[in-house]
UniProtKB/Swiss-Prot annotation:
Naturally occurring in which organism (per UniProt): Mus musculus (Mouse)
Major localisation: nucleus
Protein name, per record: SPOC domain-containing protein 1
Protein role: Protein adapter that acts as an essential executor of PIWIL4-piRNA pathway directed transposon DNA methylation and silencing in the male embryonic germ cells. Recruited to young transposons, which are specifically marked with histone H3 trimethylated at both 'Lys-4' and 'Lys-9' (H3K4me3K9me3), via its association with SPIN1 chromatin reader, and associates with the de novo DNA methylation machinery and repressive chromatin remodeling complexes. Following this, PIWIL4 engages with nascent transposable element transcript to direct piRNA-directed DNA methylation.
Cellular localisation: Nucleus; Chromosome
A single GO BP: cell differentiation
Length: 1015
């Protein structure tokens, strides 16, 4: 039955007019009371409902679903409302309804039984069509004020609740008979059979007031949002309607069912879960909040007064519902075609509406993006706790949700700083035509790419910004700035470049060099680890583990016992090419076997058998004894064996030889025995022997062996004790070597320091390990010589800077040793009277005048023969620098031009002078079978060759005897030589033969040429 017919039957035309007046008064006063204090203009018909997450279901309850509208709610639920009361009681007879009749004047809120309404609608449109004064989400947050039965005073006419309920229901709902579009959702609000069986639909009067605030209303795709559902349920509590199926409308179409629903008991639990009906028919449940709080709600007394003035006049308490965690307040709008979703109330910004997101999309985005560095809201306030999760979700997606003011300030600062740097660099390059707007665009593009890369203004964002700013501001990095200015590098590629790629070329080149140096140092350290000896840490520090003597042997020492004995018995076809016969002219020579006695001494220490090698030379003597006389062969063999093998001190009966099990061979009985003094003679002394006192290492004895150089002059100037003066870097030694002039460079020599005995080996190794680990050289304190000690690891060759000095050098398979480089100073002491070694005989010597007297004055020679140097003490002879008696080893030389004089008394022919120059020992011993005096022969004469050979052997014999003779003895050993001074030649002008007879020169011969003598 239509409403107008129903009212006409109940009270006539008067009742209908009073109803219309009451409706206008209610809409004029109720909207101003419920919507005061709002700042936004919402649509006329907005429904506010409390929704939970989609898919959450709870236990069903027969109560209705809560619905909240923008402008008020009507609760038709009352136990007094029944079918009989509705049909029996008519409208009140009062002519005019008061405008504030339905307002609760006691507390401004609705009673508890009216708060449990299952269906309530309210409109904000006034009858005259004006929009509401204010509409704010704050007004929608809590349950709005509901109409109560108490608004009808008992004394007032027509104050029954039945009349109030009917009027309230009609006042808040406008129905129309017009048809509904097929796609409209107005069928949710149709009440078939309620008033005469005609369906009633909701009437939409005006379009939206502000379409810009609700963009989703203008799109048809927004109707597909199914995450949140509308909050309307029409029908009985037990059977919520299904808006899809048409048969559901028939089930709830009876008037009796609606009346039973309206007369539901008022004591239903307000906090019980309620069924939630959606647009798609999916059942959802929502728990109504159980805690509400009152707070003042200002309302104007008169609707015509201003809102600010009215708000200050009167305050009313308001119900504020606390939304549980995870629940949002959702706003809908009624349109001509249905209900549109507006959005949810913003928890961080009051009075604003934020768009909703799909739950699946939001959760997936939360998993993909890391949590931002924004501070978490304080948990002390429950309202802030409930709003923490939406705030975090909005901050995770800056593009969709927007930036915070802090992020916006940081980004603007970065753009401004980048623009200033680029513009400053552009001013430094006048050739670069770059406008200010272009610079600003480049800076904004770089910042946008940087923010897109980091997705936040976090620490990574700031570090990358500083790196870009530093490299763009660097004046040396012009290439990077030009690439950015010419857009050769895009902003996306620029922010993804590493610090090495952004750096200038000079810095990159320097980094590469430093990396190579580091790698070289690491490789060198790894190589040195294999060369260093094993060491251990004790309470005294790092101590080197001593090795056995077998481990110190070289490959050459290990290969010597393997050589077969027959291979070493080969005869020597030619004599050794050495300078032993010139030993009287030098102090130390690398080619002299006497000077390099350390090599033979080392072989003797390794267990070699010198007596066996002496016997080998005797076998050679037997083969050559047929050519030479017996006496000459014996002397030559003795001298050669003594020179080559005498440094070996081990006798034939030494324990080492007996330990091996070899017996010394028997000497032949027909040969002469060596003197006892030569057999037991000690080895030749090394160039230097003393002790070393270096750093904190205990001093030890050592001896020197020449390695490089041609002079032992500096070696002999060394003191007995050498002490350390400090450490030097390796480069200092080479600089000192380069600073030496040519005159001093010839005196530089390198010696090898060897431990003197087994007790000194450990300290010797400690000194080597110390210098090798420190990678330094040791400077010694010597007054007249600059001495530098340097370590040389095993199997390493001599440094290339020391090889040009000459000398024997080092063997390839040598152990770890200490080398000493000796540099000369300004002056040397007088004690070092040795002469540098030279391949040629010096032109002048200290006794050249005496030699001339001997050669050219026979009387003087005879007088000198009486005072033979044999009577002189050997110590005095050695003190003058000669190791042999002067009568035997004195070199003789002729002055230039003297050989061209004619033969006469006291003068010799040039050939005779040449013969004497070849044989400096003019006074040779007299042997049986050879006459006294000198007998000069031709070069082709057999006796001439024999005489030269014998003279050389005699000279070598006396040199060796003088060098081996101990200094403690006062007299020379007995010699088989009868006289070392020959008789002077006779008065004849010609030479003498072997028997002392004169050999007259043949007729017609040149007197300047030597006479030919047929033998």
């Amino acid at each position: 039955m239509p409403v107008d017919k129903f009212l006409a039957r109940a009270g006539g035309q008067r009742t209908l007019s009073r109803f219309q007046d009451s409706l206008c008064d209610f809409l004029a006063t109720g909207s101003s009371r419920s919507l005061c204090g709002t700042s936004l203009d919402f649509p006329d018909r907005v429904l506010v409902c409390t929704e939970g997450p989609a898919g959450m279901e709870e236990a069903s309850s027969p109560s209705f679903r809560q619905a909240t509208t923008v402008e008020g709610m009507v609760s038709p639920e009352d136990p007094t409302l029944s079918k009989e009361g509705l049909s029996a009681k008519g409208p009140p007879p009062s002519p005019v309804l008061p405008p504030f009749r339905r307002k609760c004047r006691k507390c401004g809120i609705c009673p508890q039984e009216e708060e449990k309404s299952g269906f309530s609608l309210r409109f904000g449109q006034r009858p005259d069509g004006d929009p509401p004064e204010c509409a704010s989400p704050e007004a929608f947050a809590g349950p709005p004020r509901l109409l109560s039965s108490k608004d009808t005073e008992p004394g007032e006419p027509g104050g029954s609740w039945v009349e109030c309920a009917v009027e309230t229901e009609v006042e808040n709902m406008l129905f129309s008979k017009d048809g509904v579009a097929p796609d409209s959702l107005d069928h949710l609000f149709e009440f078939p059979g309620l008033f005469g069986g005609e369906p009633l639909s909701l009437v939409t009067q005006e379009p939206l007031q502000s379409p810009a605030l609700y963009p989703e209303v203008l799109t048809e795709d927004s109707t597909d949002q199914q995450e949140v559902q509308p909050a309307f349920v029409v029908g009985s509590p037990g059977t919520p309607p299904d808006p899809v199926g048409p048969e559901d409308k028939a089930q709830s179409g009876s008037r009796m069912e609606l009346e039973q629903g309206l007369s539901a008991p008022a004591n239903s639990c307000a906090s019980s879960p309620e069924p939630l009906g959606g647009l798609d028919g999916a059942p959802l449940e929502q728990r109504r909040p159980t805690h509400v709080k009152k707070r003042p709600w200002t309302s104007p007394d008169d609707s015509s007064q201003d809102h600010a003035e009215g708000a200050s006049k009167k305050d009313f308490p308001r119900l504020e519902a606390r939304v549980p965690r995870g629940v949002k307040t959702v706003y809908y709008v009624y349109t001509g075609s249905g209900i549109r979703l507006v959005g949810a109330a913003s928890s961080s910004q009051p009075g604003q509406i934020e768009p909703l997101e799909e739950l699946d999309t939001n959760s997936a985005r939360r998993k993909r993006r890391p949590t931002t560095a924004h501070p978490t809201p304080c948990q002390s306030d429950p309202s802030e706790t409930e709003n923490a999760e939406p705030h975090q979700q909005r901050a995770e997606d800056p593009g969709e949700q927007g930036m915070t003011p802090l992020d916006a300030g940081v980004r603007s600062t970065v753009v401004r700083a980048m623009q200033e740097v680029l513009w400053t660099r552009a001013q430094e390059l006048p050739d670069l035509a770059l406008r200010e707007d272009e610079v600003e665009a480049i800076a904004e593009g770089i910042e946008e790419a940087l923010f897109h890369l980091t997705q936040d203004t976090n620490l990574r964002y700031k570090n990358k910004y500083r790196s870009l700013l530093f490299n763009l501001r660097d004046p040396r990095n012009v290439d990077l700035f030009l690439k950015v200015a010419h857009c050769d590098v895009t902003p996306n590629n620029l922010v993804q470049m590493s610090s090495i790629q952004l750096a200038p070329k000079e810095l990159s080149r320097w980094r590469d060099q430093e990396e190579r140096k580091g790698l070289d140092i690491i490789e060198q350290q790894q190589k040195e680890l294999y060369r260093l000896p094993a060491s251990k840490l004790t309470h005294k520090g790092e101590v080197e583990i001593p090795r056995d003597l077998d481990q110190m042997l070289t490959l050459e020492d290990l290969m010597e016992p393997i050589v077969p004995r027959e291979c070493s018995l080969q005869p020597l076809s030619t004599p050794l090419e050495d300078t032993t016969n010139w030993h009287q002219h030098h102090q130390c020579d690398s080619n002299c076997q006497i000077c390099t006695g350390g090599e033979e001494g080392r072989k003797a220490d390794d267990g070699s058998q010198p007596e066996l090698q002496v016997d080998i030379s005797y076998n050679v003597d037997r083969k050559s004894s047929t050519k030479l006389p017996a006496f000459s062969g014996v002397i030559m063999n003795r001298e050669e064996n003594a020179i080559q093998k005498a440094p070996g001190p081990a006798p034939a009966s030494s324990p080492e030889v007996l330990k091996v099990g070899e017996t010394p061979p028997k000497e032949p009985q027909d040969r002469l025995q060596m003197p006892a003094g030569l057999k037991n003679a000690p080895p030749s002394p090394p160039p230097w022997e003393g002790s070393l006192d270096m750093f904190s290492i205990k001093h030890f004895r050592a001896k020197a062996q020449l390695i490089s150089g041609h002079s032992c002059q500096l070696v002999q100037a060394l003191p007995d004790v050498i002490r350390s003066a400090g450490r030097l870097p390796p480069s200092h030694v080479w600089d000192l070597l380069d600073s030496m002039g040519p005159s001093k460079a010839k005196d530089i020599c390198v010696i090898r320091l060897c431990p003197h005995g087994s007790r000194d080996i450990q300290n010797y190794r400690l000194l080597y390990s110390y210098l090798n680990n420190k990678q330094c050289h040791c400077l010694a304190t010597v007054q007249q010589v600059k001495m530098v000690l340097l370590p040389l690891p095993a199997f390493e060759p001599l440094p290339a800077r020391l090889r040009p000095l000459g000398g024997p050098g080092l063997e390839i398979t040598h152990t770890s040793l200490l080398l000493a480089v000796l540099f000369p100073k300004d002056a040397l002491p007088d004690t070092a009277t040795s002469i540098p070694v030279s391949n040629k005989v010096p032109k002048t010597v200290s006794f050249s005048k005496r030699v001339e007297r001997i050669l050219y004055s026979p009387e003087d020679r005879r007088s000198e023969a009486t005072s033979s140097p044999l009577e002189e003490d050997p110590k005095q002879s050695l003190a003058r620098g000669s190791l042999a008696p002067r009568s035997v080893c004195a070199p003789q030389s002729f002055p230039r031009g003297r050989g061209r004089q004619g033969p006469g008394w006291g003068q010799w022919s040039p050939e005779a002078a040449w013969c004497y120059s070849q044989h400096p020992s003019s006074a040779g011993p007299v042997f049986p079978g050879i006459g006294q005096g000198q007998h000069l022969h031709r070069a082709s004469c057999f006796h001439h060759d024999l005489l030269q050979h014998l003279k050389v052997l005699v000279t070598m014999s006396h040199q060796f005897q003088a060098s081996l003779w101990p200094q403690s003895q006062d007299s020379l050993p007995p010699s088989t030589v009868v006289s070392a001074v020959p008789d002077p030649p006779g008065p004849s002008l010609g030479p003498m033969d072997g028997g002392g007879s004169n050999c007259p020169p043949p007729e017609g011969s040149d007197p300047l040429e030597p006479p030919e003598h047929e033998c």
